[in-house]
Amino acid sequence: MDSSIAHYWAQADGVIRATAWVLLAMSVASWFLILLKLWAWLRMRRASRALDQFWAARSMDEAIAALRPADTESIFVPLAASAQQAAARRLDESSMAARIDRSELITRALRQRINEAAAKLESGQTLLASVGATAPFVGLFGTVWGIYHALIGIAASGTIAIDKVAGPVGEALLMTAFGLVVAVPAVLGYNAFTRVNRKLLAELDGFAHDLHAYLTLGARPGDES
């Protein structure tokens, strides 16, 4: 008896094949997203290492210009630019907005950019979580459907023997294995990027704190006068 995957595919009906194609699409999508986010993370690391150049500059304009080539993912530069714009903003003295303290304006600008950066970092992770959660059940559906049709075929043949049962059932279990192969990388990728994003956001929050201190007090926390 030929128990190869090719034989199983040749014997599979439309439902099994459709299930396999769905799992394949889920796998391709999750791997594409994992590689894309990995590439983006590597570029963000490059930007974070360039923060020393930012603080070594003599002015905010020079600092932003020095950081821009390294910040290809636009995570740190928009934060600094928005804070600078908020600090330099001139308001009509008669307006209600003019009563807001400049420190609060800078804080609001920084918070808005941090929220945007968080949304950017977390983009796509819902897909990874969904693939990791549903792929095993999609594979299990294919297995149940395959076993059902295998048992129907065995009943139609009128003979019950271990070799007649083990072959079709074993082939049907391939769908469960396929579902796990799809789910495991998605779950690992989701967990890894969740941890990485937490560290990046903490670093971004620290950068925002330093920016706020510089623009309101004229110095970074810890700098000697």
Language-model-derived ranges and their functions:
Residues 1-14, 155, 159-161:
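Short, strongly hydrophobic alpha-helical membrane anchors
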Residues 6-19, 121-128:
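Membrane-interface helix-boundary signature
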Residues 172-188:
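Hydrophobic alpha-helical transmembrane segments of polytopic membrane proteins
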